């Protein structure tokens, strides 16, 4: 990694970096075997995750896992306007041979189901025990090359009054992910679409920390931008979501007492409308946005 910073003035600087890296496959990616019953479209199917080096995966054309490699650049501004501190950075990261679980390869003993039947014949020819009981197979591969690029910004503003010290901060991130190589040999149309569209491109967090005498208050609002999901030929667009957390702490002589709430306004992401759910959930199965509603907590801590 090489990084440099140049101060244009007392209040403004430019910084940049270039780095390379690699990531070896984890023991889990290399060695996990896990066969479970899943419910795509509401019907039970035995689906198995197998090591890329296993006879099952080899029969369907897998290759042994190799390390990922990456190159990244960033350039940005850092400075202050009075009491307002800020950083704004652009970044671009290329990852070659990204580890990814391939889209599930269907397996069927029904000759009319052409691709799935061909997979069954391949497993049977490889001597896989119980091949006729498997409904789907997937495994990790060095699948494709991707580029992730975006902008991160952080603004911090402290202010003091007769009522204590407050610090207001805003973090903002915008990210796009694009394929740099053909991924169709590893992902189906749904997988390719979701890599680029399922995660919100925009994320922001506004936080107020306030301290006064023996009390500390934190109010944080998190924002996720628009996203969309592909399932069985259908596309669903999801609206932006905002959730607010509040926490109040009293620092006592005997112990500290904290009371707080997460998602205090009980907000939820859009419900799934195209069948991408599992196990009784009504929200997309791989959603990274909390779907459990508001929850509250109280805790007491004491240092010895």
Please identify what each model-predicted range represents.
Residues 176, 223-229, 249-304:
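C-terminal beta-signal and adjacent terminal beta-strands/loops
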Residues 1-3, 17, 64, 74-78, ...:
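Outer-membrane beta-barrel architecture
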Residues 24-89, 93, 136-151, 156-161, ...:
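Outer-membrane beta-barrel signature, preferentially recognizing the C-terminal barrel domain
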Residues 2-4, 14-20, 29, 79, ...:
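Transmembrane beta-barrel strands of outer-membrane/channel proteins
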Residues 10-68, 92-130, 228, 262-283:
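Surface-exposed extracellular loop regions of Gram-negative outer-membrane beta-barrel proteins
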Residues 7-11, 70, 81-84, 148, ...:
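Outer-membrane beta-barrel channels and translocator barrels
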Residues 1-3, 13, 72-74, 201-205, ...:
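Transmembrane beta-barrel architecture of outer membranes
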Residues 91-232, 299-303:
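Gram-negative outer-membrane beta-barrel transporters
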């Amino acid at each position: 990694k090489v990084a440099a910073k140049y101060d244009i003035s007392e209040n403004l600087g430019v910084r940049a970096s270039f780095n390379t890296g690699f990531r070896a496959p984890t023991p889990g990616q290399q060695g996990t075997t896990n066969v479970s019953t899943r419910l795509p479209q509401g019907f039970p199917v035995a689906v198995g995750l197998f090591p890329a080096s296993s006879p099952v995966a080899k029969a369907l054309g897998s290759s042994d896992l190799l390390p990922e490699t990456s190159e990244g650049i960033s350039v940005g501004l850092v400075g202050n306007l009075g009491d307002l501190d800020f950083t704004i950075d652009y970044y671009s990261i290329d990852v070659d041979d990204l580890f990814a679980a391939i889209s599930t390869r269907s397996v069927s003993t029904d000759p009319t189901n052409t691709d799935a039947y061909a997979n069954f014949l391949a497993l049977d020819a490889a001597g896989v025990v119980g091949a006729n009981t498997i409904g789907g197979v997937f495994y990790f591969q060095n699948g494709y090359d991707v580029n992730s690029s975006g902008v991160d910004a952080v603004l911090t503003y402290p202010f003091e009054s007769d009522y204590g010290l407050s610090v207001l901060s805003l973090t903002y991130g915008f990210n796009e992910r694009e394929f740099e190589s053909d991924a169709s040999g590893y992902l189906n149309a749904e997988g390719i679409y979701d890599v680029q569209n399922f995660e919100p491109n925009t994320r922001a967090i506004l936080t107020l920390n306030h301290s006064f005498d023996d009390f500390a208050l934190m109010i944080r609002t998190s924002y996720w931008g628009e996203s969309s999901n592909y399932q069985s030929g259908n596309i669903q667009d999801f609206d932006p979501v905002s959730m607010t957390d509040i926490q109040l702490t009293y620092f006592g002589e005997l112990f500290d007492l904290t009371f707080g709430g997460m998602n205090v306004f009980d907000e939820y992401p859009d419900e799934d409308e195209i069948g991408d759910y599992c196990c009784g959930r009504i929200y997309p199965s791989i959603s990274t946005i909390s779907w459990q509603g508001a929850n509250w907590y109280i805790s007491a801590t004491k240092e010895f």
